[in-house]
Every structure is written in C-alpha cells, then in structure tokens.
Amino acid sequence: MKKYNFNPGPSILPQETVNNTARAITNFSNSGLSLMEISHRSKDFQLMINETIVLFKELLSIPEGYSVLFLGGGASLQFCMVPYNLLETKAAYLNSGAWASKAIKEARLFGEIIEVASSREANFSYIPKNYIVPSDSDYFHITTNNTIFGTEIHHDIESSVPLVADMSSDIFSRPINISKYGLIYGGAQKNLGPAGVTFVIVKDSLLGNVSRPIPSMLDYRIHIKNESMFNTPPVVPIYASLQTLKWLKTLGGVEEVYKKNKEKATFLYEEIDRNRLFKGIAATEDRSLMNVCFIMNDEYKNLESAFQQFASSKGMVGIKGHRSVGGFRASIYNALPKESIKALVSVMREFEKIHCKGI
C-alpha cells in the first residue's frame, strides 16, 4: 500500500535527496568510501560544504555581510546560543507557541526578557498583533511558523531593532527579505534535510557586542572563523541538505515552491471548511502553509479515533495532532506532492459519506 507522509519532522524529503544520499552512503563521489566515512578535512567534503553554502545563499538571495553556518544541537541549542551572543541587557520576544515559550525560558538565563505579546490564552490559535517592541531591546525574537498549533507569520516583520527568527519549519517555503533580519536559525528536518544539522544565517556586524565571555562551542564568531568546522560537522545531513537545495533549484526556486505551497494548503483548508465532520483550529488569517491542524466538529468528537484508524488504513502517516491540541495535523512541507493532499482529502470525503446522512 502506498504511504503518504505527513510527519511533522523529521519529515518527507524529495525522492532525489533520498536516492542521491543513499548512493553517496555507499560510494561518495567515486571515492570508494562511504559518505559516513570520509574526513571532513578532505577535499571532497570541502567542495561539498562550500557548494551547499553557495546554493543556500543563492536560493535565499542572502546579501553581503551575512554568514551561513551549519551546526549541531538543533534549534533548541539556538534558544540559548542566540542570547549568549546577542543579549547584553534586554530582548523582546513574541510568544506565539510552544517553541517560542521554550526560547523565552532559555533567554531569561541571560538577561531581561520582555514578552511583548502572547496568544497563550487562546491556546496559541493566532499570531499576536498590535504589540510594541521597546526601542532599547538588543533584539526582537519571533517564531515564524508554529508546527504544533498551525499558525504562521506570512510576511517579513518590520522591526526597529535587530530581528531574530526561528524559521525551523518554514525556511525555503516562501520568499523572505534577508536584509530585514539580524539572525535566522532552524533545524533542517522540515524543509531542508534530515535531523542532525542546524542552519544559522547571521549578520556579521551583530556579533562581538556583548561583554560576557562566550564558550567557544557557543560563539558564532568561532564557527564563522572555522567555516562550520570548529568541531566535526554533521557530514551526512549537510550532504542531504545539498541534494534538497539542488532539487529546489530545479523546481524554479523559492518563488515557485511558494506557489505550490499555497495551492496545496488552499486545497486542504477548503475541504476542512466544507466537510461537516471537521473544523480548523487556527485563526483564518494566520493559518500555516506548512502545518494544517484540524479537529472533529463538536457533534462528531466521538469519531476522532475512528478517523485516525481509517486514515491510517488508507496509507496516511503522521496525521495525529500534537497532545497540546488533539485532533489531526497534516504537515505539508515543500517535498510533499499535491497527490498526497488529494489522497488525504479523498479519505476525509469518504469518511464523511460513511458518517453523515444525506451526503
């Protein structure tokens, strides 16, 4: 039976990424060695990581004055690495979900944190708006997409202080103006590659302005100086990420994949709004293009488990909602084909016919 992968992360990868990485694990670049065996100091690896950085910058139109890093530790390590490097006195944070909350908790170890707004009272079902960022903040931190609650900031925010963004789950999904940001970070395991590598885009002029000593492993300047090789980098995830970037370029780049993402999300949201069994949980204007969260309508709550089992029997994988929300979550990242969305919609319609009279 065909499987349709809606996992929230690690998640679906382009088939080209899977195939090329599998071949490289057997024999990397005709070296006679596995990708897992090569030295990160070898010429082949140097060429590969340099190509990855060049293509990463090209696809996002990253201007001069910014560095790109590939590190370990996941986005969770960035929750403390960002304030370690940037927070001197105080910083502003927008609390739009679970990951933003965790970032705030870590940042409070380093200085005063101003939570400018939060949607916690509504279980993070919308993106807070109409807040004021103190002009003396060292930076303003946002989480652009919330995988658990299915909300997303769909535009580049204007900020009078350096803007820091966790873009773990929507990087490369839509065009962004890098020059509006001081630092962008994220785990790769949504739209870039497998788990194990973290990307950081940082404006060089922001660094070196805090008075505290920074451990070498947590100092962006050290990693920039050593070209992401201060310690052994995550070789296999970086290679797989390069394959995804190549795939993205063949599609036509970020602008083209953004069009496809809007089409996929619209198709699924329209079915959720039409279908008598289901309803969305996120504010309509803040609905994520990456993570579509929905629950059963109140009168059909007793069918939640039945739909989960029914969908699984039809090949749907990973649609169970997070425990904080319940219901269902379809993660529809760049690599997910529209065919998978159509399959899920077909399952929803079939289930509706079974359980709703007059359909």
Swiss-Prot record:
EC number: 2.6.1.52
Cellular compartment(s): Cytoplasm
Entry-linked Gene3D superfamilies: Aspartate Aminotransferase, domain 1, Type I PLP-dependent aspartate aminotransferase-like (Major domain)
Keyword Cell membrane: no
Subunit structure: Homodimer.
Function: Catalyzes the reversible conversion of 3-phosphohydroxypyruvate to phosphoserine and of 3-hydroxy-2-oxo-4-phosphonooxybutanoate to phosphohydroxythreonine.
Similarity annotation: Belongs to the class-V pyridoxal-phosphate-dependent aminotransferase family. SerC subfamily.
Protein name: Phosphoserine aminotransferase
Organism name: Azobacteroides pseudotrichonymphae genomovar. CFP2
Higher taxonomy: Bacteria, Pseudomonadati, Bacteroidota, Bacteroidia, Bacteroidales
